[in-house]
Swiss-Prot record:
It catalyses: CMP + ATP = CDP + ADP; dCMP + ATP = dCDP + ADP. InterPro entries: Cytidylate_kin, Cytidylate_kinase_dom, P-loop_NTPase. GO terms for cellular component: cytosol. Pfam families: Cytidylate_kin (PF02224). This is Cytidylate kinase. It comes from Burkholderia thailandensis (strain ATCC 700388 / DSM 13276 / CCUG 48851 / CIP 106301 / E264). It is found in: Cytoplasm. ATP binds at G17, P18, T19, A20, S21, G22, K23, G24, T25. The gene is cmk. Keywords: ATP-binding, Cytoplasm, Kinase, Nucleotide-binding, Transferase. The keyword Transport does not apply. PANTHER family: CYTIDYLATE KINASE, CYTIDYLATE KINASE/PANTOATE-BETA-ALANINE LIGASE. One of its GO terms (biological process) is pyrimidine nucleotide metabolic process. Its EC number is 2.7.4.25.
Length: 228
């Protein structure tokens, strides 16, 4: 059955979920298939985190962090994340940067400083946005909202493989502990906690391939009467 839900002129598909659930890869492939723009909101937070480390801004100083974010020069070009005109795509994936990103994301002023930048990614013909609150806070009128989940063991294995491929060292036990701690922080923070939107479609990717996950998202989009 086709949905009768009203559509924004520029459709958005949101893909939310915890760290290492596969949402970034799935979002990128869905966007490429549809010819849509892509927003990796996690990269924005990691860029802010990297800047806070470089400029020695304390992770608990919410006002200073928000001011830092306001002045950052952030761009995405040809799949690369740039900070002050320099490609830092690999650097922002380091474990220490990820930990800092999760730590500063608990501050409402920091999140508010990044909201406008995230919403500005909505351009024709459409947008696929991945993150933790894309469907609940940033794009509540998205035409399709997906919430990806996976067991913490599956997610740790994925993150370990990803880090090793990038040339970073990683310990599986440490990754498991880190993911559990991040899940607790992200789910319990006062500002936009990690949770599925009421109208989000849940997708457990623990036993699915990337291709199967992508096809499920596209199938849901087709059910809305949209070409995919």
């Amino acid at each position: 059955m086709k949905s009768t839900r009203p559509f924004h002129p520029t459709p958005v598909i949101t893909i939310d979920g915890p760290t290492a659930s596969g949402k970034g890869t799935v979002a990128a492939l869905v966007a490429a298939h549809l010819g849509f723009h892509l927003l990796d909101s996690g990269a924005l937070y990691r860029l802010a985190a990297l800047a806070s480390i470089r400029y020695q801004v304390e992770p608990n100083d919410a006002d200073a962090l928000a001011k830092l974010v306001d002045g950052l020069h952030i761009t995405f070009r040809e799949g690369c994340a740039q900070l002050d005109g320099v490609d830092v795509s690999d650097e922002i994936r380091a474990e220490a940067v990820g930990n800092r990103a999760s730590a500063i994301a608990v501050h409402a002023p920091v999140r508010a400083a990044l909201v406008a930048r995230q919403r500005a990614f909505r351009k024709t013909p459409g947008l696929v946005a991945d993150g933790r609150d894309m469907g609940t806070v940033i794009f509540p009128d998205a035409v399709l909202k997906v919430f990806l989940t996976a067991s913490v063991e599956a997610r740790a294995a994925r993150r370990h493989k990803q880090l090793m491929q990038k040339g970073f060292s990683a310990n599986m036990d440490n990754l498991l502990q880190d993911l559990r701690e991040r899940d607790a922080r992200d789910s319990n923070r006062a500002a936009a906690p990690l949770k599925p939107a009421a109208d989000a479609k849940p997708l457990d990717t623990s036993a699915l391939t990337i291709e199967q996950s992508v096809e499920q998202v596209l199938a849901w989009y087709r059910e809305l009467g949209q070409p995919a």
